[in-house]
Amino acid sequence: FHTLGESDCPFCGQCITHCPVGALQEHDDTGKVWDALADPNRITVVQIAPAVRAAWAEYYHLDPKFATAKRMVTALKEIGFDYVFDTNFTADLTIMEEGTEFLQRFTHRDQYKWPMFTSCCPGWVRFVKGQFPEYTTNLSTAKSPQAMFGAVAKSYFAEKLGVDPHNIYVVSIMPCTAK
């Protein structure tokens, strides 16, 4: 018997949505988030994926005119988050990193395997590593937008705020269990 972590499961979440008996569920860290929000020594930062912004209105049966990004930000601030960010910010950073890497690989084609694959989806990266390990070196070395956000929040943002990175608690609201 192996755990999912020991398998080559890409953590895409399809088994959770399709299990006929509901035996599987996503990992729930809601309690940890509430604890961080209640801790006066923690700076809580949340990032929201674009798909979540689009889906929340549908889930709650809200009129699209009412379900604005501004209202979502307000709601997250009301429950206690100190800072709210859009993951699109670091998606742009990922694109710049992958673009730079592509140009490096392109100008030194003989040193790299082709084609270069994106690394922006953790499920995709895990799938390639598990099912097609011979293509692992084709993957970009750039972090996913979600992972890049965590790194930026704990380094650059912490420095800008003048706080210890350990006091920053980052929450990711993502549409996918692989993230």
Task: Show the residue positions of the predicted features.
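Cys/His-enriched microdomains
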Residues: 7-17, 115, 171
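A generic, residue-level signal for flexible/boundary positions that often mark functional hotspots
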Residues: 3, 18, 133-136
